Amino acid sequence: MLIGIVSDLHCNAPALLKAMELMGPVDERVCLGDSIREYLFSNEVVALLRDHGFITIQGNHEQVFFGPQGERPRSASWIAPDLLQWLKVQPERLTLRREGRDILLVHSTPWPSGGQYVCVNDREFSRFGEVSADVVLYGHTHEPVIARAGRTLIVNPGSTGEPRVRDERLEMSCAVLDVGALSPRIIRFAL
């Protein structure tokens, strides 16, 4: 079973379309949050996620948008009510059972972190291995990661919609996970 993984789209529909093309045929697709920007909604991105059957969780940007501070942006007349409602009811985390493996989807960390950025070289990264899942898929840092913490495989697809300059590259990325083989790959691209 192949799972296509995107995260941190931040309203970038062309990047999502490119990622879908590059991931190729997959059995399922997941979005690990931040499909929108804190105070900006994207009908196009949310429609693509919904209409292409992405299993989607919320990130910190959705939490801001659907929180008290997002009341005014949510009232914009151009936002499609059905898309707004679809995104609003998506969970903040989710565990999938695929091919006998537990796959945990989170945006930031499996533990309550207040949106903390935990990168692969951080001391806290080892805490990912404390979960009972076989695989943790997470986003938030905008940095692609394939690593292990204990027996747990950790995959971060990086940012599919908004690259950050940490290593001098402005590449967007997504990932594909072969669940049976526990074999992930990162796909880097530019528009």
Residue ranges and their predicted role:
Residues 70-76, 99-132, 162-165:
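Active-site-proximal segments of metal-dependent phosphoesterases and phosphodiesterases across multiple
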Residues 2-10, 102-109, 153-158:
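Active-site-proximal beta-strand elements of phosphoester/diester hydrolases
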Residues 185-191:
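Short, solvent-exposed aromatic-acidic interface loops
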Residues 92-100, 145-150:
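Short acidic-hydrophobic surface loop/beta-edge motif
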Residues 10-15, 37-40, 62-67, 111-113, ...:
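Active-site environment of divalent metal-dependent phosphoester hydrolases
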Residues 119-185:
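Conserved beta-sheet core of the metallophosphoesterase superfamily
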Residues 2-92, 96-97:
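Core catalytic region of metal-dependent phosphoesterases/phosphodiesterases
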Residues 93-95, 105, 174-176, 186:
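Conserved hydrophobic/aromatic beta-strand scaffold that supports enzyme active sites
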